[in-house]
Curated annotation (Swiss-Prot):
Protein name: Ribosomal RNA small subunit methyltransferase G
Family indicated by similarity: Belongs to the methyltransferase superfamily. RNA methyltransferase RsmG family.
Pfam families for the chain: GidB
Domain of life assignment: Bacteria
HAMAP family: 16SrRNA_methyltr_G
EC number: 2.1.1.-
Keywords: Cytoplasm, Methyltransferase, rRNA processing, S-adenosyl-L-methionine, Transferase
Amino acid sequence: MSFEKYKTIIQKYNQIFNLTRLDSDDKIYQNFFLDSLAPYKELDFFTQNTNLKLIDIGSGSGIPGVVLKIIFKNLNLTLLEANQKRCEFLKILTQELGLNDVLIWNMRAEDLTQSMRESFDIATSRAVASLDKILEISAAFVKVNGYLIQPKSIKFYEEELKAKNIIKTLYLERIALKDFWENDYHHLVGVYLKKQITPLQFPRPWNLILKKPL
């Protein structure tokens, strides 16, 4: 029922908030719900742990954070989105779905980390940036022994090679790589363990991340 209502809310507000070009029933279920859930369904710590704190960076229309919250109801969810209009939509969405334990922040990730360092068990995102960039802006949010979960396409291997310096600098270790197909789409999901506290100089300002990748 919640996913049917979620679909209806997307279709109702799509033109107002410019959410997506995929507004048919089939495309919303496939591209929003099934494809966004697929990378996480193989990760057993979602079902083994209760009250996990998760931050979804660049949440947009609620993918994957709201989808995960619908399935794992005990999840303490933070949705981080820099676009103000999409934050307005996220507020409407979570209210109409009746979701509890959800915080919505209209900020850039590198700004919010100053007040929420080492606060979450899991950080994740979908289609926000290349792996080196998203790891840099995500790592400081996560507690030591927490996880960064990054769904990627077949380009994962290429992106991880470029990210090797930032992975080392931020004391991250890839502990799993989930490789599977879902409806003709090849998912590669990197799961990184955070082994030490993130150095205070990270994340750097976004313009510096873009201009001077490590």
